[in-house]
Amino acid sequence: MGDLARVGKSIRHCFIKDNGVRFYGQLLKPPMSQTRTSSFFNPRRILKVDRNQNVNNGDVFQLLDGEWGLCFDNTEGYYRDAIYRTFGVIIMDKEMKWQRRKVEIDPLTKMEKTVGYEDLGMLKCAMEFTAYTDDSLKVPQPRYRLVCGKNILPGDLLDDEITVNHVERVVGVNLAYLRGKVLGKAYQS
């Protein structure tokens, strides 16, 4: 009888993470039971890797067609012992300038004040418009939802116009809620 740990090794591919580390795995379409019409982001895939591969939730890697994918917690496959791990993959279709607010304490008021922004590079993410909500002056403000593998924080600035409102850690990735200008050039590819 064949060893189940070797099944699929002949059809696996080499992928490269955004930090340059290589790993081997298979990229599969999810079963119909895992696809819903209420999916929030672009079509998902399933990444199946050997149990010893160095792949974790939140890892970003390049797909075979040149796009980037983000791994999130899915499940493991067992036959007496763990033989493989699977991750859900969200296609990262946006790359945005990412900045973090620099603060200092005002000596007079003893309150925090923003003294500039620290550039954190480019943030690969998937993002979608959710709704317009009114601010205190009844001016409609667009709201967005973003998913990424980086440690973004409330108050971070994306593309000089979008502010991170709230961040939650869900299935091993960061889900952020944003507010900002209507995104034309920044949101469109």
Specify the residue positions occupied by each region the protein language model found:
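Hydrophobic, proline/glycine-rich low-complexity stretches
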Residues: M1-N19
